[in-house]
């Protein structure tokens, strides 16, 4: 487990049922962070892909995928394993590998936005599938971003991803997410790209995330949001739900929380009446406690999409039983 001072690390562990009485020991070695290990530098690409480059396979709109298929090696390595990773988990893993969780909030947000836009460009352009490969992205820093199997995730990075996971970076008149390349800025220099250490120093000086991004990528860069998130039953209503809120979105939330409560019985069930009262707030609070969200009883952006994610998960499990 990789830890930093004063930062909470979250280590995912998969428990498997053993068919024998004998215990087994199968350690997983987590690879080193990109800022202290020497990995191959990124091979430069155009930040906006042409149709000819992508093999003429391009999505009609920007979509947050349910799953990223990560090829655990160079694109041409046929022995590399392909891992199927939920989109947000992929972004959290890459960010935990590429930047330090101890950095200022603005630098974390700027880097995470660049990581997401980089990833969604690969998704939107079908970059590797257009070249005959059956995956979304690689784990090689020479071609893409560093993803490490079973990497420790840091709580503040996880929170920021939850808050802005539907965003990406755009330029006027360009549909595709900008392919925002970056480097560390110390061992490797990269003109017109963001440098990770440089973003940290700019945040120390008080610059915001968008100011940092424009410093490196130019004044025309702006933050955009997707309209479609794959696998999510209904989009965020555009405002927080709290005591006094009413309507179909509240009813949908109540129904989903009640379904989740079947698998997590410490969550109290509530009347699905479309009225956000104290009982609904209590159920949301318990949900937030279980899934490591800020415990407010208010259904904000992060809570809404976490409820949707868990709801989809438990209903899929039930279908497969």
Which residues does each predicted region cover?
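Conserved, single-site charged/polar hotspot
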Residues: 1-321
């Amino acid at each position: 487990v990789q830890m930093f001072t004063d930062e909470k690390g979250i280590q995912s562990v998969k428990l498997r049922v053993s068919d024998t009485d004998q215990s087994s020991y199968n350690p997983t070695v987590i690879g080193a962070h990109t800022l202290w290990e020497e990995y191959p530098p990124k091979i430069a690409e155009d930040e906006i892909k042409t149709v000819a480059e992508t093999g003429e396979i391009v999505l009609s709109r920007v979509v947050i995928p349910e799953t990223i298929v990560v090829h655990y090696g160079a694109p041409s390595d046929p022995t590399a394993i392909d891992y199927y990773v939920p989109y947000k988990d992929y972004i959290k893993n890459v960010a935990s590998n590429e930047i330090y969780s101890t950095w200022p909030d603005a630098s974390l947000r700027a880097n995470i936005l660049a990581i997401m836009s980089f990833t969604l460009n690969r998704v939107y352009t079908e970059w590797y599938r257009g070249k005959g490969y059956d995956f979304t992205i690689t784990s090689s820093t020479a071609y893409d971003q560093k993803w490490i199997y079973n990497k420790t995730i840091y709580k503040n990075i996880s929170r920021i991803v939850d808050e802005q996971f539907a965003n990406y970076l755009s330029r006027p008149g360009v549909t595709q997410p900008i392919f925002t390349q970056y480097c560390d800025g110390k061992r490797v220099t990269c003109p017109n790209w963001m440098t990770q250490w440089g973003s940290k120093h700019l945040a120390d000086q008080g610059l915001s995330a968008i100011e940092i991004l424009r410093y490196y990528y130019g004044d025309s860069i702006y933050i955009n949001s997707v309209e479609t998130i794959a696998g999510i039953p209904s989009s965020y209503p555009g405002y927080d739900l709290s005591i006094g809120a009413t309507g179909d979105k509240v009813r949908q939330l109540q129904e989903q929380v009640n379904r989740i409560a079947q698998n997590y019985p410490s969550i109290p069930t509530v009347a699905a009446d479309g009225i956000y009262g104290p009982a609904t707030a209590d159920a949301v609070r318990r949900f937030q406690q279980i899934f490591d969200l800020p415990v407010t009883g208010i259904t904000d952006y992060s809570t809404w999409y976490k409820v949707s994610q868990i709801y989809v998960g438990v209903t899929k499990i039930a279908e497969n039983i």
